[in-house]
Amino acid sequence: MKAFLKILMVLVFTSVAHAKNPSTLSKEEEVLQHLQSFSAHFKQVLKNEKPLVYYGVLKAKAPNWALWVYEKPLKKEIYMNDKEVVIYEPNLFQATITPLKDKTDFFTILKRLKKQDDGSFKTTINKTTYRLVFKDGKPFSLEFKDEMNNLVTITFSQAEINPTIADEIFVFKPKDENIDIVHQ
């Protein structure tokens, strides 16, 4: 009888421990957990009185590097790391370097996302709520309200999970020696 009770207790303990530590993650949660790099074309829509639409390419790499290359309607490059943001505007011959006050880089947002009942993922960082939707097992759209309370929707296409990306692309190197560099 004692042996039976010991076996029963072990089985109960094992089932309780398993229930508290579910090892099954959704496909999307697996992607987020193992994401080390990401590349995609994007369409960014800023919804206000007159919607603004931008197109470009995003390349991001853990732990916190991102390069947003805007191609239309104006060319712009945004380099992000854990310390600063560099916004290079070739048409203005200007690069603006700003210290990053808050951890709002692409990977920080992705790592903090929590799955919602509707299947989307959400997180709030510094009073900004980010919502990510997956499609076909890959990030598809990211929504948030900017500091002016405009809704921003970024839709990804041709997304690649964990592509090989060289570290050098995340370092701003002036392409023209005549540009103004502004430190804020």
Give the positions of each predicted feature.
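Cleaved targeting-peptide boundary
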Residues: A19-K27
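A short, Trp-centered hydrophobic/proline-enriched beta-strand micro-motif
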Residues: L32-K50
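Flexible, surface-exposed loop/linker segments and immediately adjacent secondary-structure boundaries
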Residues: P90-K127
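Gly/Pro-enriched, hydrophobic low-complexity segments
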Residues: K114-Q184
